[in-house]
C-alpha cells in the first residue's frame, strides 16, 4: 500500500534547495582537498600573505534526470558498497577519446578562489601532528594576558581607569552640592580639582594556562647540489609545516639551521629566502642541531622534533659521521624526520644507508621523487598513525 506524507506543514525542512546547497558545499570541500597537493607543488606559497588567493577547479552539479543508455545487453548491478556519486554503469563512452571528437556531453567545470588562510584551515583538517609525548614538564604553566576584574583605589598609572575616576569626582561634587543645600546654602562651586580619593585603578587578575613545551628544529641542505627545484620543495615542506604547527599550538619554539660543509643558525627569513653553494657535509647540519639541543633544550623537559631536508648527495668522507649524528639526534628527539628530495639514484644517496642501518623507531624517512609527492610526504610525516606506529 502506498504511503503519502503531507509536507505542507514544514516547507523549510523539505526545501530541495537546502539539500542542493549542502551537496554543493561537499563538492567544494572535496575539490579543495583533492587539489591541495597541486597547490603545494605548483604554486609558490612561501612568504605569501594570508590574503593570497588560489583557484580551485570544481565540477558542477546537475539536476537528476533519466537518460538513454547504450542499449547494451545485460544488466549492471552494484556490490552494495557504492557511495554517493559512484557510477555502476558499464558504459565506457567518453566525451573525448584518443584526441578525437566524442559524442557525449562534457562536465561543467568552474573555479572557486580560496585564500592562504582558508587553505591552511583545510591543511589543518587534513593533517594531524604527532601527539606530544608527556614529559616531566611537557605542559608548562604560563600566565595568560591579564584581564580586568573591577576597580581598586591604588595601582600604577598605566592602569588608571579614567572614566571611573571622573565618575568618582562627579559623585563627590554632587555630594558636596547636596550637603550645601541641606544647610541652606546655594553657593556656586568653583574649581573642583581631582583628589587622591577620586582615583580608581583597574584590578587585574592573571589566569594560569597550560601550553605545550615543544621545539621544532628545521635543518636544510643548501649546498650546490640542491638546485632551485629541490630548494623550493624543501622550503615548501618547511613552510607548510611551520604554518600548520603555529595554528595548532600556542607555545612552540622554532630553530632554523642551513648548511653546506659547515652549518649555521639563521633566522626564519634567511632560512626561507637565502641561498648558498658549496659542498655537502650532512653531519654538519645535524651536529649543529645536536649542539643546540644540548645548549637550550633539555630532552627531559622538551618535546623535540628535528626535520632535515636534503637531496641525499653527501661527500663520501662524511658518511660515517652522518650515520653517527643521525643516531645521536634520534636518541635526543621524540621523532627525527629525514626528507630526501629528487634523488638522482636511490642506491647512492644517504636515504638508502639510513634506511638500512638506522634502527631507531623514532627515525622516519621519506623520499620526494616528483613535485606531486610533496603532499604525500607531508601527510606521512605528520600523520597520527605514524605516531602510534613509533610507540609500538
Curated annotation (Swiss-Prot):
Gene3D superfamilies: von Willebrand factor, type A domain. Disulfide bonds: none annotated. It comes from the Bacteria. Residues 80-94 have a biased composition (Basic and acidic residues). Pfam families: DUF444 (PF04285). Residues 75-100 are annotated as: Disordered. HAMAP family: UPF0229. Belongs to the UPF0229 family. This is UPF0229 protein CPE1333. It comes from Clostridium perfringens (strain 13 / Type A). The lineage of its organism: Bacteria, Bacillati, Bacillota, Clostridia, Eubacteriales.
Amino acid at each position: 500500500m502506498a504511503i503519502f506524507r503531507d509536507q505542507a506543514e514544514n516547507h523549510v525542512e523539505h526545501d530541495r534547495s537546502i539539500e542542493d546547497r549542502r551537496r554543493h558545499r561537499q563538492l567544494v570541500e572535496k575539490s579543495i582537498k583533492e587539489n591541495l597537493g597541486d597547490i603545494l607543488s605548483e604554486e609558490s606559497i612561501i612568504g605569501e600573505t594570508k590574503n593570497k588567493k588560489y583557484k580551485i577547479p570544481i565540477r558542477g552539479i546537475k539536476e537528476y534526470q533519466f537518460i538513454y543508455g547504450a542499449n547494451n545487453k545485460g544488466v549492471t548491478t552494484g556490490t552494495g558498497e557504492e557511495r554517493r556519486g559512484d557510477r555502476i554503469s558499464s558504459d565506457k563512452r567518453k566525451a573525448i577519446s584518443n584526441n578525437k571528437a566524442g559524442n557525449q556531453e562534457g562536465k561543467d567545470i568552474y573555479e572557486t578562489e580560496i585564500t592562504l588562510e582558508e587553505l591552511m584551515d583545510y591543511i589543518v583538517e587534513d593533517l594531524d601532528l604527532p601527539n606530544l609525548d608527556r614529559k616531566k614538564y611537557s605542559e608548562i604553566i604560563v600566565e595568560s594576558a591579564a584581564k580586568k576584574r573591577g576597580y581598586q583605589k591604588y595601582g600604577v598609572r598605566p592602569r588608571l581607569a579614567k572614566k571611573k575616576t571622573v565618575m568618582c569626582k562627579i559623585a563627590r561634587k554632587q555630594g558636596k552640592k547636596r550637603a550645601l543645600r541641606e544647610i541652606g546654602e546655594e553657593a556656586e562651586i568653583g574649581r573642583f580639582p581631582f583628589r587622591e580619593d577620586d582615583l580608581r585603578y583597574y584590578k587585574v587578575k592573571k589566569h594560569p594556562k597550560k601550553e605545550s613545551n615543544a621545539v621544532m628544529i628545521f635543518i636544510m641542505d643548501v649546498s650546490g647540489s640542491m638546485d632551485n627545484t629541490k630548494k623550493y620543495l624543501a622550503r615548501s615542506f618547511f613552510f607548510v609545516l611551520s604554518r600548520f604547527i603555529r595554528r595548532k599550538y600556542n607555545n612552540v619554539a622554532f630553530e632554523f639551521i642551513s648548511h653546506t660543509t659547515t652549518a649555521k643558525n639563521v633566522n626564519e627569513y634567511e632560512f626561507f629566502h637565502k641561498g648558498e653553494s658549496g659542498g655537502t657535509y650532512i653531519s654538519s647540519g645535524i651536529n649543529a642541531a645536536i649542539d643546540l639541543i644540548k645548549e637550550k633544550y633539555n630532552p627531559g623537559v622538551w618535546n623535540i622534533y628535528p626535520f632535515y631536508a636534503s637531496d641525499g648527495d653527501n661527500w663520501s668522507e662524511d658518511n660515517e659521521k652522518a650515520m653517527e649524528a643521525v643516531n645521536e639526534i634520534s636518541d635526543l628527539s621524540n621523532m627525527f624526520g629525514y626528507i630526501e628530495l629528487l634523488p638522482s639514484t636511490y642506491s647512492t644517496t644517504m636515504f638508502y644507508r639510513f634506511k638500512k642501518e638506522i634502527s631507531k623507531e623514532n627515525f622516519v624517512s621519506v623520499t620526494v621523487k616528483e613535485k606531486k609527492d610533496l603532499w604525500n610526504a607531508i601527510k606521512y610525516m605528520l600523520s597520527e598513525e605514524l605516531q602510534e606506529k613509533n610507540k609500538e
